[in-house]
A protein has these predicted regions:
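An extended, acidic, His-containing surface patch that forms the Zn2+-binding/catalytic region
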Residues: 84-297
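Midchain, well-structured core segments that form catalytic/ion-binding scaffolds
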Residues: 1-148
Length: 297
């Protein structure tokens, strides 16, 4: 139900400067059973990939929590309606099911357990995460986070069903060029100049897009989100500073405007991957050179 509400939901696309991200996509769904048994799975997990142009990590975790609440409400209502029908069919007295909607972010669960158990919990969960990484350094980052949450759940007294929303994978920061700073203005102006100079050598018009719609190393060259948003990211990432490290200060020490002047092609990362030779090996180097030269004036 949660996947139905999130996956390919265009209401969750992020629009900025006239460009729209693709909607969230489900990357994996699984229960915790190691093999086949006739027992109903007690727990499950799902990964969703969010693409952002202007949304912060705080915005994303808020969206996930709201969708989790909606999904939980729907499932509880559906279960009660189905159970009511079954009781009628079986001539059994219907009693409303005891389950209620219960959704946490990882930060909320962590705070609740800290308030109840104090330093005993925080020390235990930190040592657990640290030792888990030392014993299984190659463990997938997402599975690492799940194991940390499983361990924390042992400290929860109320074992009734719940959803925990968290950040499980690496953080590829959004890069938004607005032209609001002098450096951004200069870079955008230099790019425009290089395009005008090279355009007459191209068969097709060169179009500037304000966002690179894929994963790029440029995400580690600047930070468009504020520090508070990054703190929200860390507080909702079980692997933060035990297995996964994102040095905000290092990124901020660079913090330069970024553009991607790259090749044009098709079927990236496939056996049929290919590029437009003239554009890639002539136009792109020329635009890169002219952009740099213009910036150095």
């Amino acid at each position: 139900e949660l996947t139905r509400l999130i996956e390919l939901n265009t209401d969750l696309c992020d629009e900025a400067q006239g460009e729209v991200t693709i909607p969230p996509i489900s990357l994996k769904q699984s229960d915790f059973k190691e093999g086949y048994t006739v027992q109903t799975a007690l727990a499950a997990y799902a990964y969703y990939n969010f693409f952002t142009h202007s949304m912060s990590p705080a915005d994303v975790i808020d969206i996930c929590k709201k969708k989790a609440i909606e999904a939980f409400d729907n499932v509880v209502n559906y279960a009660n309606e189905s159970y009511k029908k079954y009781c009628k069919m079986s001539n059994v007295e219907y009693t409303k099911l005891p389950w209620k909607t219960r959704v946490y972010t990882w930060e909320e669960l962590y705070v609740e357990l800290t308030e109840k158990h104090g330093g005993k919990f925080t020390k235990h969960i930190y040592n657990f995460a640290k030792e888990l990484n030392e014993k299984q350094p190659t463990l997938d980052l997402r599975l690492f986070s799940i194991k940390v949450i499983e361990e924390a759940w042992k400290w929860v007294e109320d074992k009734s069903p719940a959803i925990v929303a968290f950040f499980g994978s690496i953080f590829s920061a959004r890069i938004e060029m607005t032209g609001k700073t002098e450096k951004e203005k200069n870079l955008l102006s230099a790019v425009d100049y290089s395009i005008k100079e090279v355009q007459n050598q191209c068969e097709n018009p060169i179009k500037v897009r304000m966002f690179y719609p894929y994963i790029s190393d440029s995400s580690f060259m600047a930070l468009s989100d504020d520090v508070d948003s990054i703190e929200t990211l860390g507080k909702n990432m079980p692997s933060w500073k035990t297995k996964y490290f994102y040095d905000v200060e290092d990124v901020l020490s660079v913090n330069v405007p970024v553009v991607n002047i790259g090749s044009f092609g098709k079927d990236g990362h496939k056996i049929t991957e290919r590029v437009h030779m003239k554009y890639t090996f002539e136009n792109v180097p020329n635009m890169s050179y002219l952009t740099i030269r213009e910036l150095l004036k």
